[in-house]
Amino acid sequence: MSKFLSQAAINTLRNTRLGSRQLVRSFAGISNTRNHREAGHQEWGCGQSAGRGLLELRMPVACRRSMFIQTQDTPNPESLKFLPGVDVLGKGNTYDFPNGTTAHSSPLAKLLFRVEGVKGVFFGADFITISKQEGAEWSLIKPEVFAVIMDFFASGLPVLNDAQPNADTEILEDDDETVMMIKELLDTRIRPTVQEDGGDIVFMGYEAGVVKLKMQGSCSSCPSSIVTLKNGVQNMLQFYIPEVESVEQVFDEADRMIDSEFERFEKNLKTLKQQEPSGGGPH
């Protein structure tokens, strides 16, 4: 009975968000019927069995009952959203780990980056978005991610150690009226929709009519992110705030350099493995 009530509660929450999601997507000209998304994949744990993906796990019964993990597709085929059924960072909070070197502040992120094929990790209020390396298979990554998530939340360890979630839309004393309106609109109308897709938009600044934003999570490498940014976010900001002339996407150069180094390291590692002599006894 409790399982059905939990699912009903989840459906109710989704329905309450529908209005704002339709509003943002109407500005972007995006249909609500997305062919690329299969909503509501429901899975339990880390190794599928018959039926609805019920998974056997070597954990106490109480832990198994409390950890109900769902997966949800995102607009980015390289990213998948995991919903563990418990708070990850809490309402409105997000944190991005674009690569393994940024995971030092989170025990959970460190463990997830140990899963082969994981390229990026993103924490939301009640979800975790995993971005995979090109060519990696979800069928191999998902069971490992399920196991890490379930074991971690059963341990009771904090998700973040000494880091603070994004506070980019917090109103500051020196913010002028336009900046305050931009932050308010991002926080109340735009970010909830983007977070539903497993990502986030971070406010980086406003100058001379230009709003600078950084895409995170599934949105950072999504093929449609530019369309969403220009046609959806920009149109909405301009509709409510006449001072806004355009929206620009900001890229973190440090993250780009780290990603480049990781790619080079992985290529070198593959080359070394290919050069290793095949196993065999002495000749």
Curated annotation (Swiss-Prot):
Transit peptide: 1-65
Subcellular location: Mitochondrion
GO cellular component, one term: mitochondrion
Gene Ontology molecular function: iron ion binding; iron-sulfur cluster binding
Stretch list, region NifU: 182-250
Binding of [4Fe-4S] cluster, residues: C219, C222
UniProt keyword terms in alphabetical order: Iron, Iron-sulfur, Metal-binding, Mitochondrion, Transit peptide
Pfam families documented for this protein: Nfu_N, NifU
SMART domains listed in its UniProt record: Nfu_N (SM00932)
Stated role: Molecular scaffold for [Fe-S] cluster assembly of mitochondrial iron-sulfur proteins.
Family according to the record: Belongs to the NifU family.
Protein name: NFU1 iron-sulfur cluster scaffold homolog, mitochondrial
Organism per entry: Drosophila sechellia (Fruit fly)
